[in-house]
């Protein structure tokens, strides 16, 4: 039997709120939970995910592991020819 007066109040119908709109209900120790992102507006789950290429890291990865597009492979060939001529 649990001890009395030591457990938090349980709210079985706690509201999850995102941007002022109730998006779901769940059980929690707070009556309302404020969130910025949830599965309904997260880019991964909505299919609108974009890759942010910071400082060309994606291109660098693609070149390193041989997954580069034909445009970047042509540039690589030109740069290697220039190095050989020098």
Swiss-Prot record:
Q: Does the keyword Isomerase apply?
A: no
Which residue ranges have biased composition labelled Basic and acidic residues?
Answer: 73-86
Q: Does the keyword Transmembrane helix apply?
A: no
Keywords, sorted A to Z? Ribonucleoprotein, Ribosomal protein, RNA-binding, rRNA-binding
Q: Which InterPro entries match?
A: Ribosomal_bL28/bL31-like_sf (IPR034704), Ribosomal_bL31 (IPR002150), Ribosomal_bL31_A (IPR027491), Ribosomal_bL31_sf (IPR042105)
Spell out the molecular function terms from Gene Ontology. rRNA binding; structural constituent of ribosome
- What does the record list as GO biological process? translation
Indicate the quaternary assembly. Answer: Part of the 50S ribosomal subunit.
> According to its UniProt entry, what is the function of this protein?
Binds the 23S rRNA.
Family per similarity comment: Belongs to the bacterial ribosomal protein bL31 family. Type A subfamily.
Name under which the protein is recorded: Large ribosomal subunit protein bL31
This protein's encoding gene: rpmE
